[in-house]
Amino acid sequence: MVSVSEIRKAQRAEGPATILAIGTANPANCVEQSTYPDFYFKITNSEHKTELKEKFQRMCDKSMIKRRYMYLTEEILKENPNVCEYMAPSLDARQDMVVVEVPRLGKEAAVKAIKEWGQPKSKITHLIVCTTSGVDMPGADYQLTKLLGLRPYVKRYMMYQQGCFAGGTVLRLAKDLAENNKGARVLVVCSEVTAVTFRGPSDTHLDSLVGQALFGDGAAALIVGSDPVPEIEKPIFEMVWTAQTIAPDSEGAIDGHLREAGLTFHLLKDVPGIVSKNITKALVEAFEPLGISDYNSIFWIAHPGGPAILDQVEQKLALKPEKMNATREVLSEYGNMSSACVLFILDEMRKKSTQNGLKTTGEGLEWGVLFGFGPGLTIETVVLRSVAI
């Protein structure tokens, strides 16, 4: 008779969870940051608020963002005036948009990831879907299963309303699933659409205005599995260790609330300070077992919450400016796409590493870190190992 421990051992994979493919997608509507303040104040009927517009222009200029992609076009916004008004009841209109657009954009990214992976989609055993954009039942995971034509018995996990740290959360969950289910192939999809957070400006709530200057739409998809099939599956990064922690004394630093007016975000001014204050402890916990204490010797994938966070982290750890190149490039080209951002940065890094003729997918280095920051203030840490190119 077979023992439970033997059954458990047979169910586990041999090697670490590995990212086997990455795909990304954005809406067709591209918004140039330099002209966005004019568009934003015009479409929200706020052109008379000249001082506020000047403040918003400065926010956009300092954002280090060149362009963003948005589902919301001028035409859609004109048809939905309540979405443009500050705190006007508009949840129904917003929900009607995102319950369709989140799975649609997610599908676009997933199709690219599945194509790169090179295996039939029938081999996908698990599906993780994450979005901060709206809620529905059955969820975006169900809709995506239908849109992609996945098997009806694929094991689904739906994460709603997590926020910007969740790119790390999906990797942590995918790692556990891949390593504890032999032969598992996990499709991970983060799809974010700002239709839930867009609203007109307010003189009294400048933190809301910060979000209007930073957030963009995007979806990213990964295939994760252990023990890659030789000659068929091509590993990109290995996931070695993960952690999640709530930063001490950070309650209310970042929070979001789904209300009649949509999803409202609140940020304390000291969010960059809280992140930089807690990052050393997270790094020590992650890299001390590997004997690594020089954080310039690893590659970096950090959620680009905004330029101030990146600047303070660089300063705190005395990082060389090039360490955040991939992160800053994604921020510049796409803005803050919440949970999808770090997955875009993984894609950017492996592509640039190949283009530049480097030895590994991690800018020529072996070890790296992925950080997610978001509501709580919650910090997700993932230790990555690159793969030889």
Curated annotation (Swiss-Prot):
Its EC number is 2.3.1.74. It catalyses: (E)-4-coumaroyl-CoA + 3 malonyl-CoA + 3 H(+) = 2',4,4',6'-tetrahydroxychalcone + 3 CO2 + 4 CoA. SUPFAM superfamilies: Thiolase-like. Keywords: Acyltransferase, Flavonoid biosynthesis, Transferase. It comes from the Eukaryota. GO terms for molecular function: naringenin-chalcone synthase activity. Pathway: Secondary metabolite biosynthesis; flavonoid biosynthesis. Gene3D superfamilies: 3.40.47.10. Substrate binds at residues 197, 216-217. InterPro entries: Chalcone/stilbene_synt_C, Chalcone/stilbene_synt_N, Chalcone/stilbene_synthase_AS, Polyketide_synthase_type-III, Thiolase-like. Changing residue 336 to A/D/H/K/Q: Drastically reduces catalytic efficiency. CoA binds at residues 55-62, 308. PROSITE patterns: CHALCONE_SYNTH (PS00441). Changing residue 303 to A/D/N/T: Drastically reduces catalytic efficiency. GO terms for biological process: chalcone biosynthetic process; flavonoid biosynthetic process; polyketide biosynthetic process. It holds the Pfam family Chal_sti_synt_N. Coiled coil: none annotated. Changing residue 265 to V: Decreases catalytic efficiency 2-fold. The primary product of this enzyme is 4,2',4',6'-tetrahydroxychalcone (also termed naringenin-chalcone or chalcone) which can under specific conditions spontaneously isomerize into naringenin. Belongs to the thiolase-like superfamily. Chalcone/stilbene synthases family. Homodimer. This is Chalcone synthase 2. The lineage of its organism: Eukaryota, Viridiplantae, Streptophyta, Embryophyta, Tracheophyta.
